[in-house]
């Protein structure tokens, strides 16, 4: 335990296994003056950690138990971890030869004791596939204002069709909005068909065991396929009852 509390050398194997060693070393440089940017770096004897190659620091982060999660900076740098994760997702998506999925959720809770607790929740998801195909989803629930909102966007490179629906369970107000990016409203149906054709190539097949079980339960007859998700129009709008917006 005492060994971990002192500043060890980067070559020490214990340094590589201690997730807080890099943080302590950084603090030591800051307290020694100059915040790690000494004007005399060029004439040091080479023992100063800041003058060593970056590969040594990268190696230490890689061996650290939390290094791969972006937590090697000490105290579990959550913002750094999120930035690294988003950067890795964008890098993989830009490669054009993989499918990616990312999701983030923010929840705020407060209870002052003079009423019902206030909860705010926001979730964002993104799925991507080769060819610049993306699906974005965003949901918001705010107990204070009574707002519930959901938006789904389909993207093909720089074109997008975004459908957003919201309601207020306190006032009963409902709203629907459609946004088009580099599209005309008359091109929306053709764009949706193109998006479904492109995404159908990447749908996962169900396991063989599941198909066998389904066939045995259904007397040898299988369903034509899993049900498609859909957002249907409001029931109080007769003009939209026959409309089906498949996602």
Swiss-Prot record:
Keyword Plastid: no
Entries under PANTHER family matching the protein: MYELOID LEUKEMIA FACTOR
Entry keyword set: Cytoplasm, Nucleus, Phosphoprotein
Recorded superkingdom: Eukaryota
InterPro entries registered for this protein in UniProt: Myeloid_leukemia_factor
Species, as recorded: Mus musculus (Mouse)
Record field: compositional bias (Acidic residues): 182-192
Compositional bias annotation for Basic and acidic residues: 134-144, 170-179, 193-225
Name by which UniProt lists this protein: Myeloid leukemia factor 2
Subcellular location per the Swiss-Prot or TrEMBL entry: Cytoplasm; Nucleus
Pfam families cross-referenced by the UniProt entry: Mlf1IP (PF10248)
